[in-house]
Amino acid sequence: MQTHEIRERFTNHFVNAGHTAVPSASLILDDPNLLFVNAGMVPFKPYFLGQQTPPFANGTATSIQKCVRTLDIEEVGITTRHNTFFQMAGNFSFGQYFKEGAITHAWTLLTNPVEEGGYGLDPERLWVTVYLDDDEAAEIWEKKIGVPAERIQRLGMADNYWSMGVPGPCGPCSEIYYDRGPKYGNEGGPAVDDSRYLEIWNLVFMEFERGEGTGKDSFEIIGELPKKNIDTGMGVERVACILQGVENVYETDLLRPVIDVAETLTGATYGRDNTADIRFRVIADHSRTGMMLILDGVTPGNEGRGYILRRLLRRIIRSARLLGATGETMEKFMNTIMDTMTPSYPEIAENRERILRVAITEERAFLKTLVSGTHLFEEAAASIKSSGSTTVAGAQAFALHDTYGFPIDLTLEMAAEAGLEVDVEGFESLMAEQRSRAKADSQAKKHGHADLSIYREWVDNHPTVFTGFEELESQSRVLGLLSDGTRINEAAEGQEVEVILDQSPLYAESGGQLGDRGRILMGDTVVDIQDVQKIGKKLWVHKAVVANGGLAVGDEVVAAVDKQWRHAARQAHTATHLIHAALRQVLGPTAVQAGSMNKPGYLRFDFNYTDQLTPEQLNQIQAITNEAVDTDWAVNTIETSLEEARAMGAMALFGENYGDLVRVVEIGGPFSMELCGGTHVEHSSQIGPVALLGESSIGSGVRRIEAYSGLNSFNYLSKERALAESLSSILKTPSTDLPERISQLLDKLKAAEKEIATLHRRELAAKSEEFITGAEEINGIRAVMVRVQDGLDAGDLRTLATTLRDKLSNGEGLVVVASRSEDGTKVPFVAGATKQAVARGVHSGNLIKLIGSYIDGRGGGKPDMAQGSGSDIDGLDAAFNAVRAELENL
């Protein structure tokens, strides 16, 4: 039975029973807390919460809702159970029928013969679960429907009780499972093996109201609802698997055609290799989800829903390339999935061209960078491995993201495939820095206001006269005051204000140099200037706080620059010019400035260059810069025409738009000559020492040098010298020999760590018999639960757990071992169970989750082996007691 027919039969069944057919809502709802619709009942929430009256004639409705869940994108393809898009068929009753009606409707549709409009499932292969205390539902299933008692299983709140996770409606639920047969797992119903027994329908009986609480089973039931409601959800894809007789959703009529096309495009074959199969499934799943997101108006972007779509599309592209595709593939994938989905969603036809355009555009943009980005990553990975490291630096991950458009998720995926980890914290730090810069740039452009028209009168009629090249104090008049973007006539003490003056000696931020700090003075009035921004290259806006007294429009005042600020800012700006000149001497004329930022005592200089600078090159640049400082060259400024400046050899930077009259800053004749409107020292010696802090890559072909100047540089070098002297004293080694001495110590440390690890393993092996001898007998299960010595990692614990489990393999046995990291911040723990214990019902993964809840940790795994990590070692005894209680209850 084709999927579109499964959908039609569902809708017809409930419409014939008096339900109103409700079309699927968009995947995008006007809910800021919801990325995508992720459950069939989401569009009906206002009715269940009592916020709106259900508009349906009989108080009942049915829908087949398209849903997207993207929390586990990385799991897609690894197993056949994860899908990012699915269809949830549901029927809903608002105060009409309740348990018996919901159960009867579901059973009838599932088991009625195909010729009578049902799905024709064998009743003998259907199992049901009910909530532990829901005798009513159990009785309906057994007495009314005729399901044998042995195929009705009772489960707890975690499995068979529903709520929205917040105070509001809740209630028990009953789930219907299909027995796929012995080749899929153990008999005994869904409580024993959910791999064999496939959940196909969940019936939620909303009859109570819950209170506060977290988790699935840690809240109080505070009363009954005035009306009892029904919310059910049947997985369309799961029913399709059964009715089409296939192993999983990837084999159904919805997704298998995409895999077939992928085989043709790549030359690979599905079903022969697990790694290749994962990529085939990624292509199939993500093609459908991506297409449906585009259908509902999502476009690729760098945030929110757009980022999810971009991530999905790029995973398709990369998976196809890894399978062997050499050209564009998106058009064929999208056309194929649209063909399979159009019978269920006819609106796809009228949006076909748009969907293709969005997907193909994204593919072409990404393909331009995928090859080079992948090559860059592979080079980095090879270098990392050859150095003995296992971590991709945050800066490398950031470069992939910032330069090649690789989302961090893709870098994480590539790293995992290469057996590497990623310094995510370092990446996030660089991202935060980038966002901070972008925000600062945006604020500088907007000058604090989205609407700059408020400055228009002053820009046109009263541009600021800048006197700061000639003097540090000016007699000025207050032309205007603004507060929160609104013009005011006067400002009181403590008020933040923007001040417009007729003339000002304070430099307004531009050309990479931050605005001056200073004061506005008038009698007892003191106004602290915290920043100066420029509007339209003509108007200086002084952002300030009235520290004492008051200020009014028309006041005659003194505007004064903070002399220390200006001096240190001039040092940094002139040092920037010297470093640029030194760079070009060392690296050649292609090392052209791409951006800069300088403030008192510090500068950041970006330049076009592809390779990482060597320590020798950095030393050369620093030496040439300080030689220029020591030479005490005059720093001259010349105002001339742009043509004349270029004829002189002055460098114009950034692709800026210059006026007819420009300012040239010349240092040491031909050594440095640039167009610049900033403030500078009179002689290069006034800069003081310049200390390079290092260099890094900030993008494709762009690198950055950071440096201190003046007093900051002196303080930095003093600290470096003190550090070297301290190390020399501690290691009893001359400072010139420190690198060799430290290298020797590191070699010894590595050897010692290796020896300690060997001793640890021997000690653990010796203790294993002691642990076995001390095993507890709990409900027939021999359990070893111990905290071993500090410093063991998860790998050590896993080895120990495996050894101990093997020693218990002749019966029902459980092992739980835990340690604590040397710094005391982490608590790794591992659990392992013998085959006999697993058959008894022991599940190591579940026990790991239980332990994690006591020690502020998390983890999981398989029934026979699982691991986790926490942080609170003090909770370990309570965690072990909880495990004992679980074993007692088996």
From Swiss-Prot:
EC number: 6.1.1.7
Cofactors required: Zn(2+)
Keyword Repressor attached: no
Subcellular localization(s) per the UniProt record: Cytoplasm
CDD domains: AlaRS_core
Domain of life, source organism: Bacteria
GO BP: alanyl-tRNA aminoacylation
Keywords: Aminoacyl-tRNA synthetase, ATP-binding, Cytoplasm, Ligase, Metal-binding, Nucleotide-binding, Protein biosynthesis, RNA-binding, tRNA-binding, Zinc
Cofactor binding remark: Binds 1 zinc ion per subunit.
Role summary: Catalyzes the attachment of alanine to tRNA(Ala) in a two-step reaction: alanine is first activated by ATP to form Ala-AMP and then transferred to the acceptor end of tRNA(Ala). Also edits incorrectly charged Ser-tRNA(Ala) and Gly-tRNA(Ala) via its editing domain.
Family classification: Belongs to the class-II aminoacyl-tRNA synthetase family.
Domain notes: Consists of three domains; the N-terminal catalytic domain, the editing domain and the C-terminal C-Ala domain. The editing domain removes incorrectly charged amino acids, while the C-Ala domain, along with tRNA(Ala), serves as a bridge to cooperatively bring together the editing and aminoacylation centers thus stimulating deacylation of misacylated tRNAs.
Name of the protein in its database record: Alanine--tRNA ligase
The encoding gene: alaS
